[in-house]
Structures are given as C-alpha cells and as structure tokens.
Amino acid sequence: MSLVTSLTYVLPHRLLSSLARALAYSKSPATKQWLIDTVTRKFGVDLSEAQEPDPRVYPTFNAFFTRALKPGARVPDADPQALLMPADGRISQLGPIENGRIFQAKGQSFTAAELLGDESAAVPFHNGLFATVYLSPKDYHRVHMPWSGTLRETVHVPGRLFSVGPDAVRNVPRLFARNERLVCHFDTDFGPMASVMVGALLVSGVETVWSGVEIPRYGDRITRKDYRGKGITLERFAEMARFNYGSTVIVLLPPGVAALEGGLAAESSVRLGQALARRQVA
C-alpha cells in the first residue's frame, strides 16, 4: 500500500473535498488558470477534442474539467444491439456478479447489496454482469447511458471519500461500497439497469442532467428520490451525469441480457461509446 493510500485512512476527507470544491469553482483568473495549467501538464490532458480547446476561455477549473467534446468526437458503436461504454477511462474490473458479489481486486470484493444500499434492489442483478470504469483526471468527465432507459429512482448512499486510484482499489477493502455514491436505477426494455456514480477524495461534486448537483450531501442516512411517473427517459449514448473531478462509474446488468464484448479486461483503456456488451437476442 502506498503512503498516499495509507494517509487516506486518517485524512479529513470532507474538509479536503470541500476545499477542492471551493478551488474548482473559484473565478479568480490566477487561481483557475494555475489549476488548469497544472492538471493539463501533470496528467497530459488533450484539449484537441474539446469543444473549446483554448484553456484560457474556461471561467472556472470546474468548467474546464467538465468540458464538452466536439460533435462527433465520440460516436456510439454501430451495432444497435451493443450496450455502450459509459465513459472514457480505464476498466478497473468487469465480469459476472457471482453469488451477489462484485470483484474489486485480488482478494477484494463487496456485495451488490452493499454497493446499492439495498438488499432487495440487488436481487435482480445476481448472476448478472458488472463493469467498473475509472475516470482519471485527464479523461472526459461526463457519463453517458449504456442503453436507453427511464429513470425510476436515485439513492444517495453516504460514506467515506477514499481515493479511487489503482493503489486504493488494490488495498482498501470494499472501497466502492464504502465511498459516498449515487445509485441511479433505470427501467429498460430488458429490465433493470443501474449506474453507480462513486465519489472520491477531492471530487468536488457529482451532477445529473435531471437534478443538478447530487453529491456532496451531508448526513449519515440513505436518501431516495422516486422518479416513477416523471417521464425522465434518456436514450442510449445520451449524457446522464458528470464528475467534477476524476472518479468511478459502475454499471450493473441483470442476468441473461448481454454478453461482455470480447477483448475487454481489467486495465483496458476504453472510450465512451465503444461496445461494453452485446444483447443476447433469442
């Protein structure tokens, strides 16, 4: 375990993330430009695909970080039966949900019920599939729909704000089931689908297209929002949310719906819109 990961056990997660939020939304020209230049240089951010490639134009660091891409920079897989990768990034893990458990790293796993904050909500995903995608600071930070769906419910699960970098994933037990997260439940033509937006150290917020800022929230109680009857339907490949710094999205699918795309594995670099899985059509 690295020193940084060890320190995250004792660091004041909330305070640091609050400070990160204040800096991310600062309109001080000197502050925001220093942040943009530092992150661009340190992580090798490529602005050639950005709708606005000039880093000086962004009013805040957060505006830079959640930047839009040029039209056509990402396109969905041409196969209409392909479920899509929800984001640019790197696959942390993917595979079957065996006995209700989701694999995190060697010797590490957690239950779908822990992740979703609800035992009954996890049942439809037992023996289904999951994919965990890590968005690094250099990546495009908007998350899109793998498949068309109608929003049924969101569940805010309070928790810690550990780093979600590779070292933390290997060494912090049940990491994604411990961090603060927003669970988004959708109804699709094949049944339920869940997209879980996981918060992390220095993540200044998670926003959804239907409700705005969802994280951070304060308190230690799970909170739910019922969207049934609201008619919030998002099409395959449509934007659903964005991270205001790097973090992780986990997609859960029920059994018998799709087969994972060949060639995908842990550590694979992926791009929004490429095939994650393909429908199993009888």
UniProtKB/Swiss-Prot annotation:
The record marks 246-247 as: Cleavage (non-hydrolytic). The active site is at residues 88, 144, 247. The keyword Lipid metabolism applies. Is synthesized initially as an inactive proenzyme. Formation of the active enzyme involves a self-maturation process in which the active site pyruvoyl group is generated from an internal serine residue via an autocatalytic post-translational modification. Two non-identical subunits are generated from the proenzyme in this reaction, and the pyruvate is formed at the N-terminus of the alpha chain, which is derived from the carboxyl end of the proenzyme. Its cofactor is pyruvate. It is a peripheral membrane protein. The modification Pyruvic acid (Ser) is found at residue 247. GO terms for biological process: phosphatidylethanolamine biosynthetic process. Binds 1 pyruvoyl group covalently per subunit. GO terms for cellular component: plasma membrane. It comes from the Bacteria. One of its GO terms (molecular function) is phosphatidylserine decarboxylase activity. Keywords: Cell membrane, Decarboxylase, Lipid biosynthesis, Lipid metabolism, Lyase, Membrane, Phospholipid biosynthesis, Phospholipid metabolism, Pyruvate, Zymogen. It catalyses: a 1,2-diacyl-sn-glycero-3-phospho-L-serine + H(+) = a 1,2-diacyl-sn-glycero-3-phosphoethanolamine + CO2. Pathway: Phospholipid metabolism; phosphatidylethanolamine biosynthesis; phosphatidylethanolamine from CDP-diacylglycerol: step 2/2. HAMAP family: PS_decarb_PSD_B_type1. Catalyzes the formation of phosphatidylethanolamine (PtdEtn) from phosphatidylserine (PtdSer). Heterodimer of a large membrane-associated beta subunit and a small pyruvoyl-containing alpha subunit. This is Phosphatidylserine decarboxylase proenzyme. It comes from Xanthomonas campestris pv. campestris (strain ATCC 33913 / DSM 3586 / NCPPB 528 / LMG 568 / P 25). The lineage of its organism: Bacteria, Pseudomonadati, Pseudomonadota, Gammaproteobacteria, Lysobacterales. The gene is psd.
